[in-house]
A protein has these predicted regions:
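Non-catalytic structural scaffold of enzyme domains
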Residues: 1-220
Length: 220
């Protein structure tokens, strides 16, 4: 978000966090499609140029299954490296999605590890500083992967801690590809020096704005 704020000059960026339906990771594909449709409708009155599903779980489970209502949709999807042994860390729902099943079928060197509850633990850490027992949650994973794909937009927040557990791994995230797609989807960018305006909508708007101003989303 911070990079978009500085890159997309003169734009208004709306951020909505769907706390009402969390967690996404334990929901079925059909449930996630309904949630995506409902949340997309919240943005339509603002006539957005682009709507971003900034969640791997939502992105992988709704690909080709949602009505974009004439709006450009950008999704955050897991990234892999062909021909290199890798580990995809993700939610249970992401692991069960058709997208990841196909990804696994096409990449025999890819292991998929759904980490139950990790996204929620990261939320608790962000909100109240509760320590995450990463080593315990990932105790069954090998430590010698060539790369680790962060298949949840929460996971980059703890990348430094993950690096301690996977010291040999390169870390990948689909967020970079999504960022490029967002920037390319905006056809007019002001040349003035002022950045974009970031607005938070929904019941938790005030709390999100506070966290954002504290730099919690600096790497998100």
């Amino acid at each position: 978000m911070r990079r978009l704020e500085h890159t997309l000059k003169g734009q208004t960026l709306l951020y909505y966090a769907d706390f009402e339906n969390l967690p996404y990771g334990n929901k079925s594909g059909d449930e996630l499609v309904k949630i995506a449709e409902k949340n997309l409708e919240k943005f339509l009155p603002f006539c957005p140029k682009t709507v971003v599903f900034a969640c791997n779980t939502l992105s992988t489970n709704t690909l080709g299954k949602t009505n974009p209502h004439g709006v450009r949709l950008v999704r955050v999807l897991p990234k892999v490296k062909v021909g290199k042994r890798g580990l995809l860390l993700c939610t249970e729902a992401t692991a069960n999605s058709d997208y990841v099943r196909l990804l696994k079928k096409e990449n025999s060197l890819l292991d998929v590890l759904p980490v139950k509850g990790l996204a929620e633990e990261i939320e608790k850490w962000v909100r109240c500083g509760k320590k995450i027992n990463l080593e315990g949650m990932l105790r069954c994973a090998d430590r010698d992967y060539g790369y680790v794909s962060l298949g949840c937009t929460h996971y980059p927040i703890i990348q430094a801690e993950l690096k301690k557990l996977f010291p040999l791994a390169e870390f990948l995230s689909g967020e970079e590809d999504a960022f490029d797609k967002i920037v390319n989807s905006v056809t007019t960018i002001d040349t003035d020096d002022h950045g974009s305006e970031v607005c938070f909508i929904g019941k938790e708007a005030k709390m999100l704005k506070t966290l954002y101003n504290k730099g919690i989303f600096e790497n998100v």
